[in-house]
Amino acid sequence: SEEEVVTRDYIQSGKADLVCILVDASQLERSLYMLADFVGIRMPVMLVLNMMDVAEAAGKKIDVTAIEKRLGVPVLGFSAAETERYPEFFKKMVSAIKTPVCLDSGSLREELVGGGELAEKTDDIISRIEAALGDFEYGVCEKIWIAEKLLEKDKLICGVVNEMLPFARKNAIDAILDSEEGRDGGIL
C-alpha cells in the first residue's frame, strides 16, 4: 500500500531514533509478520504487544519477558485502551532510545525460515542471493532483507537492484530465482 511505501522509505532513510512495531497480542502469530518483515533492517526497534487485555480475556498467556529475551530487543505488553499505562509505554520507549538495539538477523535466521525441507531450500536460495548481491548496500537494509524482498518480487526493491547492481550480478540472481521457481524471464 502507499502507506507501507511511505513508512518503509522513512525507515530506510535512517532518520528515526526508534521504530515501535505495534502488533496485536490477541492474534500474535498472525501479527508477527510485521516483525519478521523488519528483520534485516539495521534500525533500533521496540516491540509493543498491544491488546494484551483482549489476549488475556481469551485465555492466552504471553510471556513478554521470554519474547524480549529471545528477540534481544525491548518488548512491552500493552493495552492502548488503558490510558493509565501510557507513562509505562513512554518510559520503555525513552529507555529503548537511550539504549538502542536492532534485531539480529543472524540469530533469528532459523525462526525466519522455520524448519523442514522447504525451509532449508528457502534458506539456501536466500543465502545464494545474498552471495550474488556481493557488496551491494541499500540504506539501513541488510542483504538478508534485500534477498527476501527479491524472493517476494517486491517491485521497489527489484527496481532498485535492477538500477544499481551490475549486469552480471543481476543475471546471477535471476538464474537463482529462475532455477528455483522453474520459471523463465527473471525479475530484474
Locate predicted features.
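Generic serine detector
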Residues: 1, 13, 26, 31, ...
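Conserved C-terminal guanine-recognition region of P-loop GTPase G domains, centered on the G4
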Residues: 2-76
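Helical mechanochemical/support elements of P-loop NTPase systems and associated helical scaffolds
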Residues: 3-6, 15, 30-34, 59, ...
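Structured core elements
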Residues: 46, 76-79, 146, 187
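Canonical P-loop GTPase G-domain recognition
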Residues: 53-114
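Extended helical scaffolds that flank P-loop GTPase cores
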Residues: 72, 96-99, 104-188
